[in-house]
Curated annotation (Swiss-Prot):
Molecular function (Gene Ontology), one example: hydrolase activity
High-level lineage: Bacteria, Bacillati, Bacillota, Bacilli, Bacillales
Keywords annotated in UniProt: Hydrolase
InterPro entries listed in its UniProt record: Metallo-B-lactamas, RibonucZ/Hydroxyglut_hydro, UPF0173, UPF0173_UPF0282_UlaG_hydrolase
Species this chain originates from: Staphylococcus aureus (strain bovine RF122 / ET3-1)
Superkingdom as given in the UniProt entry: Bacteria
Family: Belongs to the UPF0173 family.
Protein's name according to its UniProt entry: UPF0173 metal-dependent hydrolase SAB1566c
Length: 229
């Protein structure tokens, strides 16, 4: 299995001969190394509806025929308003099996909406974190979130091999809370900081996060770099 980071919160997972992308913010992402014209993907998984996560989902889904996995509200919105054919709606606490592995939606403390061209925001359900089980490994993508103690319950129920955690502050946890979440609650084998340096408001030094973490290994990935099992 291979997990690649592509700026902001975009993660590309390759496992069981399938390709999965999380939060495909590609075209307008100054940190993303991917090309929307050449990305190949079988599944798209969304944590919430903000532009830097919802990103290129419509174009990518229509171009590739990928199944989009997201909140029930996002699935309905993509199907009804954008004509995306393959959608799979879920909600917090639910788990579903796919041919690459399983997806479970867990809690995240954030917000979730998409703003139309007319400036009107559309509610797209609760924000979520994602627990993947693929090839015998557990990957926890926290999504955009603040610190919450039930991260420990999530990790107790699903001991985490790799955790993708935001460190950007302002909109999500900063380095202090993110490192506390890793050290005290999640305790993964590998931590990967995400959701930083894309915009001025979330500029951070990931080395400070690495220095603050005292459990497992911290992998600071540049866009295009990966962790492989």
């Amino acid at each position: 299995m291979k997990l690649s980071f592509h700026g902001q919160s975009t993660i590309y997972l390759e496992g069981n001969n399938k390709k999965v992308i999380v939060d495909p913010f590609i075209s307008n992402n100054p940190k993303c190394d991917l090309n929307i014209e050449t990305v190949q993907v079988d599944y798209i998984v969304l944590t919430h509806g903000h532009f830097d996560h919802f990103g290129d989902v419509v174009e990518l889904a229509k171009k590739t025929g990928a199944t989009v996995i997201g909140s029930a509200e996002m699935a309905d919105y993509l199907s009804s308003y954008h004509g995306v054919e393959n959608v799979h709606g879920m909600n917090i606490g639910g788990k579903a099996n796919f041919d690459f592995g399983s997806v479970k939606f867990v809690q995240a403390f954030h917000s979730s909406s998409f703003t139309h061209e007319n400036g009107i925001p559309v509610y797209l359900g609760m924000p979520i974190g994602i627990v993947f089980e693929v090839e015998g490994k557990t990957i926890y993508h926290t999504g955009d979130t603040g610190l919450f103690s039930d991260m420990s319950l999530i990790a107790k129920r699903h001991p985490v091999d790799v955790c993708f955690v935001p460190i950007g502050d302002n909109f999500t946890m900063g380095i202090d809370d993110a490192s506390y979440a890793i050290n005290e609650f999640i305790k993964p084998k590998i931590s990967v900081p995400i959701h930083y340096d894309t915009f001025p408001l979330i500029e951070q030094d990931p080395q400070q996060f690495k220095d603050a973490v005292n459990v497992g290994d911290v992998q600071i990935l540049k866009p295009g770099e990966s962790v492989q099992f």
